Amino acid sequence: MSRRRRIYEGKAKVLYEGPEPGTLIQHFKDDATAFNAKKHQVIEGKGVLNNRISEYLFQHLNDIGVPTHFIRRLNMREQLIREVEIVPLEVVVRNVAAGSLSQRLGIEEGTQLPRSIIEFYYKNDQLNDPMVSEEHITAFGWATPQEIDDIMALAIRVNDFLTGLFLGIGIRLVDFKMECGRLFENEMMRIIVADEISPDSCRLWDIKSNEKLDKDRFRRDLGGLLEAYTEVAKRLGILMENERPAGSGPVLVKS
């Protein structure tokens, strides 16, 4: 088997050259990181769950007309994606006060926000991904005003879809992070959703118990991250009740 050419390696994923021009292979690692990799642990099976959950969500977004980079799943850890030029921004959509928003503004965690709030963060680990305004984004050329409008429109559509989807399986979408990229097709360019959407990039709380089913279990040393991700996958119908993700550790089995 020929050795694949690695294009990029991040904290939780590796990108390899794809089989056709304009494609990449996105590989999900088992690494769990927080606070820009200051905290790090390998949790066996996490990459499999994130791959399958992100695949499920991106395929549904494609189906309702929200453009994403996702083409198809290749195996348990990898998916074929369209190659895009990543906009160097993290787009955070908040529905409920939590995390840094609660700390910055002194709002009690769990407080429902008056409306969904969209925030932008400059993707730069050395600077700890600082929060930026639209003025910063356009002044430094990270995105044009039209691209910002397109990104915000996508963020609202993704939020509406995810909120309803998770509500239907007893999960509250507190907030989520997404990234966008520029897809070049012939002479045209359009903004599409890229990266991943998974419990790594969302805050997901059980509606009844407020139990955290996301990466806060790792950030806050709550334990049970793999079990929480498995529970999300089961509720989405991705895993059967007693199915075990390939290469994973213990899996939650409901009594």
Swiss-Prot record:
Keyword Ligase listed: yes
Database matches in Gene3D superfamilies: ATP-grasp fold, B domain, Phosphorylase Kinase, domain 1
InterPro entries: SAICAR_synt/ADE2_N, SAICAR_synt_PurC, SAICAR_synth, SAICAR_synthetase, SAICAR_synthetase_CS
Keywords: ATP-binding, Ligase, Nucleotide-binding, Purine biosynthesis
Top-level EC class as recorded in UniProt: ligase
Domain of life from the UniProt record: Bacteria
Any one GO cellular component localisation term in the record: cytosol
The protein's annotated pathway: Purine metabolism; IMP biosynthesis via de novo pathway; 5-amino-1-(5-phospho-D-ribosyl)imidazole-4-carboxamide from 5-amino-1-(5-phospho-D-ribosyl)imidazole-4-carboxylate: step 1/2
Any one Gene Ontology BP term: cobalamin biosynthetic process
EC number(s) given by UniProt: 6.3.2.6
Catalyses which reaction(s): 5-amino-1-(5-phospho-D-ribosyl)imidazole-4-carboxylate + L-aspartate + ATP = (2S)-2-[5-amino-1-(5-phospho-beta-D-ribosyl)imidazole-4-carboxamido]succinate + ADP + phosphate + 2 H(+)
GO molecular function per UniProt: ATP binding; phosphoribosylaminoimidazolesuccinocarboxamide synthase activity
Family: Belongs to the SAICAR synthetase family.
Annotated protein name in UniProt: Phosphoribosylaminoimidazole-succinocarboxamide synthase A
Gene name linked to the record: purC1
